[in-house]
Amino acid sequence: ETTMSTTMDVQSEENVRIAVPSKMCIDTLKALPNQPVTFTISPDKNAIELKSEFGRYKLIGQNADDFPKIPESNAENSFNIPSGVLSSSIAQTIFSSGNDELRLSLTGVYVQLYKDNAVFVATDANRLVKVERTDVTPGVETSFILPKKALNLLKSNLPQDDSTTQVDFNESNAFFSFGDVSLVCRLIDERYPDYRAVIPEENPNKLTINRTDFLNSVKRISIFGNKTTNQINIKITGSELTIHAEDIDLSNEAVERLGCDYSGEDMEIGFNSRLLIEMLQNLSTPNIIIELSSPSRAGIILPSENVDNENLLMLLMPMMIAGNA
C-alpha cells in the first residue's frame, strides 16, 4: 500500500539488482562509524557481502524480480506544495484521525483541492481539525483520502524548508516527490462524510484565554477525573473560567479557576480532557479562542492569530454533564 524509494551516488563496476534484508543491513550500518562501505553482490546466489574497515559481513538477499513492483505514476493531476507547508498540514491534522477500521474513511486525512487553495481535514467523530492553505494552487478541484501510515512516513522524511514537493495523483494512488525521495501510497477508496455539517455556524459565546495556562490547568485537573470517561467540566461566568473533574468511585476531585476574556451567556460544558489536551498541544499561539453555542453542541477552538496563508479550525464534541440531561 505504501512504497518509498530513493537514489544515491555510488561507485559501481557494473549494474546489478538485488533485494536486501533491510533490518539486518540497517542495523549493521547503524553500528558502523562514518566510513566507506563496499558491497559485493553475487546475483546468481543472492549473496551479499559488506566490507568495512573493521571486517566483512555476509548475508543472503532475494531475487530483485520477486520484489513488489512500484506503481507507475500515470498521474492524471499534479501540483506543487512547499515541503514545510505539507509537513505542518499533516502534523496539524493526522493526530485527529480515527483508528476504527470499520470506519475506514476516518482513518486518514481528507484532502480537498481547489484551483487556488487546499484543505486538509481529519476527524475521529469526536474531534475534527481543518487546515486551509491559501498558498497552494492545485489548479484543479477534486478530493481524496490519504492513509495515516503513509502520512506518518511522509511527515518524518519531508524536509522542513522552502523546497518543493511535487504531488501527482490518480484515482487509486498518490505520488510524492522531493529531493531524491519518492513515496507512493494507495488512496483510501471510501466516501468521506460531510464534515461541514457538524461545524456550528452560529457561536455567539466567545472565550479568549492563554493557551499554556489553560493546557496546564486541564492536565492537572484531569489527574483527578474518571479514567474511563476522561471528562472535565468547564464553567464560564463573566471573566472567570472554572475547570472541575471528579471520580466519584474513588472520591477524587479537583477544581481550578482561571481568568479569561469572555463575551456571552454563562455556560457549563463537558469535554474529554485527553482529546482537549492533545488539541491544545497542537496549537502554537500564546492565546486561543473557544467559540460555543450551547452545552450540547461542539466547541470550536481557534488560534488567536493564524499564521500567514493558513486558516486553522479545531472542533471538539461535548460530553453530557450529570444533571443537565
Regions found by a protein language model. Name each.
Residues 1-325:
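Structural preference for solvent-exposed beta-strand-turn elements
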